[in-house]
């Protein structure tokens, strides 16, 4: 299976949805499924699904469809879920704690190694047996523990400073929950989760019927 060059971000963002739904099929002991059946369940057209998957190889068989387990494993491999990623959370407030306690991350290979906060009253408190540390120790911790992913859950005013510490520590990717677009070097990958923007999109959809 060889990844083709120039895969669009739209295709990449659809892959996790395929992966999640295929897992549900396996949990229900469903062994195979057609692109048409996938289309009806996921909401993308059958043609779109086939085009997406063809970007990475030929997975289906005409007249048979897709082997669910095989496709699940192939998509997991494409997404990079075949190894572990050492991860830290910065910001031990409500969002940070919710992420730390989300068990599926560990199953997917995201290994939480450290939690950091700026509030001294939080230091030493444990979440999932991991003690919250002073954010001033972040850069050295990232360097010493081969941390690849930093999850930023701090207020907007502190987010860029935290980001800079992560970058200086050698981080490779940032999952950003702060309502700010971070300034990072070109080789650092950032995935933003701006909750207020998602809510505003929902409000628009509640008030308009012009979305195709």
Swiss-Prot record:
Q: Which residues bind DNA?
A: 17-56
Q: Does the keyword DNA-binding apply?
A: yes
Function noted in UniProt: Modulates transcription in response to changes in cellular NADH/NAD(+) redox state.
GO BP terms: namely:
negative regulation of DNA-templated transcription; response to redox state
The family note in this entry says: Belongs to the transcriptional regulatory Rex family.
Supply the gene name: rex
What keywords does the record list, in alphabetical order? Cytoplasm, DNA-binding, NAD, Repressor, Transcription, Transcription regulation
Q: What is the lineage of its organism?
A: Bacteria, Bacillati, Bacillota, Clostridia, Eubacteriales
MF terms in GO: DNA binding; DNA-binding transcription factor activity
Instruction: Please give the Pfam families that the UniProt record associates with this protein.
Output: CoA_binding, Put_DNA-bind_N
**Protein name per its UniProtKB record:** Redox-sensing transcriptional repressor Rex
Residues reported in the UniProt entry to bind NAD(+) = 91-96
Q: Which NCBIfam families match?
A: PRK05472.1-3, PRK05472.1-4, PRK05472.2-2, PRK05472.2-3, PRK05472.2-4, PRK05472.2-5
One GO CC annotation, please?
Answer: cytoplasm
Q: Which HAMAP family match?
A: Rex (MF_01131)
Checking PANTHER family in the record gives: REDOX-SENSING TRANSCRIPTIONAL REPRESSOR REX, REDOX-SENSING TRANSCRIPTIONAL REPRESSOR REX 1
Describe the subunit structure: Homodimer.
Q: Where in the cell is it found?
A: Cytoplasm
Main localization (coarse): cytoplasm
């Amino acid at each position: 299976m060889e990844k083709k060059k120039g895969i669009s971000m739209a295709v990449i963002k659809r892959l996790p949805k395929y992966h999640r739904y295929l897992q549900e099929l396996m949990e229900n002991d469903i062994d195979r499924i057609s692109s048409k059946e996938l289309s009806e369940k996921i909401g993308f057209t059958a043609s779109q699904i086939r085009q997406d998957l063809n970007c990475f190889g030929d997975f289906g068989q005409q007249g048979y469809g897709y082997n669910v387990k095989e496709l699940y494993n192939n998509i997991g491999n494409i997404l990079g879920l075949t190894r572990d990623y050492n991860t830290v959370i910065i910001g031990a407030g409500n969002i940070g704690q919710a992420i730390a306690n989300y068990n599926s991350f560990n199953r997917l290979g995201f290994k939480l190694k450290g939690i950091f906060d700026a509030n001294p009253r939080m230091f030493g408190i444990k979440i999932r047996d991991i003690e919250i540390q002073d954010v001033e120790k972040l850069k050295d911790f990232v360097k010493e523990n081969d941390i690849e992913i930093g999850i930023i859950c701090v207020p907007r005013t502190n987010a860029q400073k935290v980001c800079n510490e992560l970058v200086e520590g050698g981080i490779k990717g940032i999952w950003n929950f702060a309502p700010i677009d971070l300034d990072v070097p070109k080789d650092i990958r950032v995935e933003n989760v701006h909750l207020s923007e998602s809510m505003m999109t929902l409000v628009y959809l509640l008030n308009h019927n012009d979305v195709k």
